Every structure is written in C-alpha cells, then in structure tokens.
C-alpha cells in the first residue's frame, strides 16, 4: 500500500527534527530546472503568478535565490517534519517514533509542485510552488505538463514491489495534486477516502476537517502497519466512521456527526 498526501504551504523550520535520519529527494535535477526558471521572476511576478501578498512573494523570491542542489541538514529538513498545515497536524509526525517513520518511508508519499514526489524523510528546502500554478516551462504551459508521467512512474516503481491486496494506492491528496498522477497508467487500483461532516442538515466535505482527516488516515495506516485496504474501514479516529452505504470499491466514505 502506498498512501499519497498533498504538501503544505505552511512550513516549520524552527522546531528541531526529533530523528537524525534523512534521505535525498529523487527529482533534484527536475527541481533545479524549475528553480532556474523561478529565479527569472521578480517578486512582483511571483505575487501575480501565485496570487500572494508582496511580503510572501519577497520571501519566496529569496527562497529561490537561496535554494541549492546540495541538500544537508543545515539547509533542509525532513519533509514530513517541515510541512506544517492541516494534513500534517493530523499526521503529527513529530510524535511518531523512528520505527514508525521508517514504516512511513516505505508507505507514504507526498506530491509536490517543485519536488515531484517526496518520501517522508527526504530533505526539503523551503519553497512555495503549488501544483496548480500555471508556471510555463520548457516542457509545457504548467506543472502538470512539466511532470508528465514522471510521478506516476515513480509510484509504479514502489507499487510493483507489492503484491495481492497490498498493491493499492490510497489517495489522500487534494484534487489539485492528484491531477499530477495518471491513474490509467498506475500499476494498482486507487482508493480515495472521503471525509464528511454533518452541517446544515446534511453531510458535506468541510475543507479544514477533511484535510486534517487525511493526515489522521495516513497516521492510522502507519501506526497499524496496514497493507490490506479492507482494514481502512476500521478507521474511527476523532469520531469518523466508515459508511458502507455511501461507499464503493474506489471511494471510502467516512462520516462524522457532532452536535446537531
């Protein structure tokens, strides 16, 4: 089983990593090519391209200038410890043991606009480049064109080492990021967990809660060493429960009703 997550825009480089082990990203040459193009942009260009504030644009202008193809613990941090958004609050890698993180290294992947595909312990230099950014490059009009089928092929390399029910990809990424994967070319079926909360008289996806729940699901897989997708149905963290009637073979729906 491989579970894929989206990255986070929020990053934490202040908290020291609680594990010393790390690995290097697989697509450093590709990231270097993107950085080369990003360095041609002014802070105002970055603000316009990414629809971000001027201070944030200046921060990322400097990040691109500082970025190095050489990754060390001095200029980078393990990806799953550096990302700090809703998904990663749910995953809470800081409280996972080194043994848990070693398991995550084999079963969790993070999709990235700059780095393509990351393992949890791959070193990450700070950046901002969302997958949906229409950043024209030598390979096409946007990052989907840039990455082509590279991410899918990298996932297949991992999936092909699994067999039976364990050869499955669990999609806990956003629509924006999972568009960088080509399901028809994958060497495994895809299961997408969907998390809904009761609000206004019906169940609906509430972005903040759904993002956190994706991280909780990834943690559930890691802590319980899950390889068979049927075991995902037992997920019941923070009040969610599997709804068989609303689910099918490719979409697992989890619902939560608090209050009302």
UniProtKB/Swiss-Prot annotation:
Please name every pair of cysteines joined by a disulfide bond in this record. Answer: none
Listed InterPro entries: YaaA
Which family does the entry's similarity section mention?
Answer: Belongs to the UPF0246 family.
What this protein is called in its record is: UPF0246 protein BceJ2315_22780
> Record's Gene Ontology CC terms?
cytosol
For this protein, the record's HAMAP family field holds:
UPF0246
Kindly list the biological process annotations in GO that this record carries: response to hydroperoxide
């Amino acid at each position: 089983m491989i579970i894929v997550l989206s990255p986070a825009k929020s990053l934490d480089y202040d908290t020291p990593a609680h594990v010393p082990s790390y690995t290097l990203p697989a697509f450093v040459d590709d990231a270097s090519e993107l950085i080369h193009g990003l360095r041609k942009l002014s802070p105002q260009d970055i603000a316009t391209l990414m629809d971000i504030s001027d201070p944030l644009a200046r921060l990322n202008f400097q990040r691109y200038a500082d970025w190095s193809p050489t990754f060390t613990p001095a200029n980078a941090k393990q990806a799953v410890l550096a990302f700090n958004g809703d998904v990663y609050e749910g995953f809470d890698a800081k409280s996972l043991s080194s043994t848990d993180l070693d398991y995550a290294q084999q079963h969790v992947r993070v999709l990235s606009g700059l780095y393509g595909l990351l393992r949890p312990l791959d070193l990450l230099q700070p950046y901002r480049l969302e997958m949906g950014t229409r950043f024209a490059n030598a390979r096409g009009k946007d990052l989907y064109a840039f990455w082509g089928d590279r991410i899918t092929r990298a996932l297949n390399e991992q999936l092909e080492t699994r067999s039976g029910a364990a050869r499955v990809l669990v999609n806990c990424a956003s629509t924006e990021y999972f568009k960088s994967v080509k399901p028809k070319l994958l060497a495994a079926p895809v299961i997408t967990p969907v998390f809904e909360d009761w609000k206004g008289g019906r169940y609906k996806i509430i972005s903040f809660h759904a993002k956190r729940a994706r991280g909780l699901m990834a943690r559930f897989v890691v802590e319980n060493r899950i390889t068979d997708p049927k075991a995902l149905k037992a997920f019941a963290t923070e009040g969610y429960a599997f709804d068989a009637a609303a689910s099918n073979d490719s979409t697992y729906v989890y619902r939560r009703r608090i209050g009302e």
